[in-house]
């Protein structure tokens, strides 16, 4: 759909279209940190991206939409267990979509969170080289970043939510 729109309209008009999504500010009820780790090693080639795109079904999109809405609600209400559950569930849906999304390095990025008060998953943006984390403890964020460094993963971004 987007390719057709881009061919027929200028970028400003394309951006103004209703894509069925919305961007809104999310006010979190709790003190969380958001971290992005970079493995420096894309796992997905152009061919793999096309394969993943062809695997995306309406069922997958509906499941992910439900997860996102549940996550949004959990963050607004400060429900840590639901936040963790939804991040994990989203990561599992990405794995089911295409196991190759999780490179060995991305698996390490997620496994580094073990025994910490954090949750992690692939960013899901398509390159297979970044993971995102929600941390519920500044101390655990520091421990996680050190674990990442020890396996060559770089902290790309960190902010408080």
Residues covered by each model-derived region:
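C-terminal nucleotide
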Residues: 1-125, 132-161
């Amino acid at each position: 759909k987007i390719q057709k729109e881009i061919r027929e309209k200028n970028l400003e008009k394309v951006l103004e279209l209703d894509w069925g999504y919305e961007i809104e500010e999310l006010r979190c009820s709790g003190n969380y940190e958001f971290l992005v780790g970079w493995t420096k090693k894309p796992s997905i080639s152009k061919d793999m991206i096309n394969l993943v795109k062809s695997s995306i079904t309406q069922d997958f999109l509906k499941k992910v939409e439900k997860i996102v809405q549940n996550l949004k609600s959990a963050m607004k209400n400060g429900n840590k267990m639901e936040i963790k559950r939804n991040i994990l569930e989203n990561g599992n849906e990405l794995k089911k979509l295409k196991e190759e999304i999780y490179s060995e390095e991305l698996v390490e990025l997620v496994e580094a969170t073990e025994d910490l008060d954090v949750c992690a998953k692939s960013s899901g943006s398509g390159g297979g080289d970044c993971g995102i984390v929600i941390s519920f403890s500044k101390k655990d964020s520091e421990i996680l970043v050190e674990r990442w460094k020890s396996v060559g993963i770089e902290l790309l971004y960190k902010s408080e939510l």
